[in-house]
Amino acid sequence: MSSALAYLHESLPLTSEVSTTLSVSANVAYEVFADAVETPRWLPLVQSAKIMNRHQDGRPSRVGFTAKLDRGSVSYSLDYSYDPKALCVTWRNLTSSSMILSGEARFIHLSSRASLMLYRLDVDQPIGQWDEQSDGHLASAVVAEFREHLRRLC
């Protein structure tokens, strides 16, 4: 089961939100998603990820990404925050960046083999072919790729 919502604020960015059930525990889903450097393994849009800084607990605090677009690629960095008690990961690009990219992934316990994923993505620019393929609802496309990755992994 999935539900999706996309809406425009008074000005950009475009926010899209989606929720879906996953066939793994919330803790497992959180840990897999929180491993940001592994994002290229499950998100085809992302070509590479490199840890630039770490939090004291060892988790990545800043990750540099390269994403493929229709006619080239774009590099960007995201700052990550983690809340292991709430099973929530948030990210935001640098304020000096030419684009806005931020979001949140939250995982809610349903059972030992199921969880609910709540995902929000804020972007201020279309992301090429991916945006077209997802009918402008990029969050749904990202969550579908993550769910498929979990299915293969677990």
Outline where the language-model segments fall:
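Hydrophobic pocket/interface hotspot
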Residues: V28-F33, T39, V63, Y80, ...
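Generic short beta-strand segments
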Residues: S3, G64-K68, R120-D124
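Beta-strand/loop substructures that line and gate deep hydrophobic ligand-binding cavities in soluble
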Residues: R92-E148
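Short, surface-exposed coil-to-beta transition loops
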Residues: T15-E17, R62, S73-S77, M99-E104
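Generic structural detector for well-ordered beta-strands
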Residues: S19-S23, K50, S81, R106-I108, ...
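Glycine-rich portal/gate segments that line the openings of hydrophobic small-molecule binding cavities
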Residues: P40, I51-T95, E145-L153
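Hydrophobic ligand-binding cavity/cleft-lining segments
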Residues: M1-G58
